[in-house]
Amino acid sequence: MLMPVAQGGHQLLTTQITISSNTQDFDLQAHLTNNFGWNGSDAIDVTVTINSGVTISASAVTTVAFKAHMASGTVLTLNNNGQIIGKGGSGGTGGGGTSGGQSGQAGGHAVSFQDLTVTVNNAALALIGGGGGGGGGGGGSQAVGSAVDSEGDCTGGTNFGAGDGGRGQGTDGSGSGCKVVNYGGGAGGAAGKAIRHVSGVSQTLNNSGTISGATS
């Protein structure tokens, strides 16, 4: 239920929400519109509490686990006693015989804020974490020819170093022959943010738990 309260000489709608079971892709604006009759344009004062043992997760790296893109002037208090976790990126495809590995996919963000003043209280044992970036694919390897010099040694070997970042799902190829060309592994994907600010955000962060990733 939305209740009007006076704040700074203005009427501001207020409500409290408790999340008591695991949820994916929680959208605060949609939740308020669908369940509380909020019109989506008036500023609102809302407190959201995530219970201990509850996980808010994202279904894809292109979505966030907890989204609060609100009307300007909104005040949010987010009490997290559980886990808010972004989606991890996929590993890059390993290279073929004549190519390097592909880069890993960037991880998704855990929380996204827009147009609000927010206080985040992350309790002891609670977690807010962006999704980890996927490992880069391992580089391929190509053997070329079997040239031998007068002393019986192979010549002409060429090696290309692996790319930056971990190679999570890929394994570098190996080849035999006199000249072996090893192609670089792909770069690891970037980690998602714990908290992303789109625009118009004033944030106070009180952290007694774990936060993995950037917070703005």
Q: Where in the sequence are the language-model features?
A:
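Enriched but not universal
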Residues: M1-A43, V201-S216
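Glycine-rich repeat segments that build the extracellular carbohydrate-interaction surface of secreted
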Residues: Q16-S20, S41-I56, L76-N79
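Leucine-rich repeat
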Residues: F36, A68-H69
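Glycine-centered low-complexity coil/loop motifs and glycine-rich tracts
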Residues: G53-T63, H69-T74, N81-F113, A123-V198, ...
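Ankyrin repeat structural motif
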Residues: V118-N122
